[in-house]
UniProtKB/Swiss-Prot annotation:
Keywords annotated in UniProt: Electron transport, Membrane, Mitochondrion, Mitochondrion inner membrane, NAD, Respiratory chain, Translocase, Transmembrane, Transmembrane helix, Transport, Ubiquinone
GO annotation, cellular component aspect: mitochondrial inner membrane; NADH dehydrogenase complex
Gene Ontology MF annotations: NADH dehydrogenase (ubiquinone) activity
Protein name, entry field: NADH-ubiquinone oxidoreductase chain 3
Keyword Amino-acid biosynthesis in annotation: no
Family matches, as Pfam families: Oxidored_q4
Xref: InterPro entries: NADH_UbQ/plastoQ_OxRdtase_su3, NDAH_ubi_oxred_su3_sf
Subunit note: Core subunit of respiratory chain NADH dehydrogenase (Complex I) which is composed of 45 different subunits. Interacts with TMEM186. Interacts with TMEM242.
Record gene name: MT-ND3
Compartments (UniProt record): Mitochondrion inner membrane
Primary subcellular site in the record, as a coarse category: mitochondrion
GO aspect biological process, one term: mitochondrial electron transport, NADH to ubiquinone
Domain of life: Eukaryota
Membrane protein topology class: Multi-pass membrane protein
Length: 115
């Protein structure tokens, strides 16, 4: 009985709100209010925007390094080892791996988007 009453109340309230919104007139209608706004860009213009592939590659590289740091760096402390040498060795290995991969990206000119 309570379920039926709750459903009936919700349905009635939703229907009432839809009817009120449909029948109320829009006040102060003018062209700027009814035109679409796309973050300062003209929505009626060309949909083709210039795309920088170098910037995209730098952004992807940043995301990869960021995920590596966020996911792999806590690994030595999450391994629950009591041996401090093992933990520090794992951490040092991961830091060296990140440094070597950063140096590789740098030498391959993967971090520059100006040519």
């Amino acid at each position: 009985m309570n379920l039926m009453l709750a459903l009936l109340t919700n349905f009635t309230l939703a229907t009432l709100l839809v009817i009120i919104a449909f029948w109320l007139p829009q006040l102060n209608v003018y062209s700027e209010k009814t035109s679409p706004y796309e973050c300062g860009f003209d929505p009626m213009g060309s949909a083709r925007l210039p795309f920088s592939m170098k910037f995209f590659l730098v952004a992807i590289t940043f995301l990869l390094f960021d995920l590596e740091i966020a996911l792999l760096l806590p690994l030595p402390w999450a391994s629950q080892t009591t041996n401090l040498n093992t933990m520090l060795t794992m951490a040092l290995f991961l830091i060296i791996l990140l440094a070597v991969s950063l140096a590789y990206e740098w030498t391959q000119k993967g971090l520059e988007w100006t040519e």
